[in-house]
Amino acid sequence: MAGYLFVHFTGEQKDGEQIYFSVSRDGLHWTDLNNGKPVLYSHIGECGVRDPFPVKNPMNGRYYLIATDLRIEKGEGWQAAQERGSRDIIIWESEDLVHWEKERSHTVGIREAGCVWAPEAVFDEEEQAFLVFFASKVKCDGEETAKHRIYAAYTKDFVTFSDTFLYMERCLLYTSDAADD
């Protein structure tokens, strides 16, 4: 079937913070796969995922799916998730978008980060690597309160990553919000 794949989570209910797939031929009418049940589960970290982002490696054709390691449904709420949440991303890998390797995690958040949320990745031709960027809530020296900043790291294989660095200082939670400015 040629068309669109929608990779998503459904909310904060039981099994809502897992990975669901839906497909569409026209981008308007969608069919849930796997009878509307999660296609992928996270059994590591917080045992829940949000903000899934699929990406294809242009060098070898492999697919990667990265997501926020977060489970609000069983946790202490949003405030705790921002201040004491996971600093990991959850990663799945596939050759065909059907068969997926067991999930793994990687710590990309800096030591001072209260969370790592909404990871996305783009392939940087110049670096011949993926730039993985994400929001982290960090309190910097001289600040009264922590704020979300965008950090990033490079990876060629989603196994080893460069050191994490501050990518964008603007107060954004999702980098797609920057398009509105």
Describe these PLM feature segments:
Residues 2-5, 61-65, 127-132:
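Entry beta-strands of beta-propeller and related beta-repeat scaffolds
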Residues 42-49, 110-116, 173:
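Short glycine-/Asp-/Thr-/Trp-enriched loop segments that recur within the blades
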Residues 68-86, 137-144:
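Short, conserved, GDST-rich strand-edge loop motifs in beta-rich repeat architectures
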Residues 30-42, 99-109, 157-170:
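Blade-edge beta-strand/turn elements of extracellular beta-propeller
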Residues 21-23, 88-95, 151-155:
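Beta-propeller blade signature
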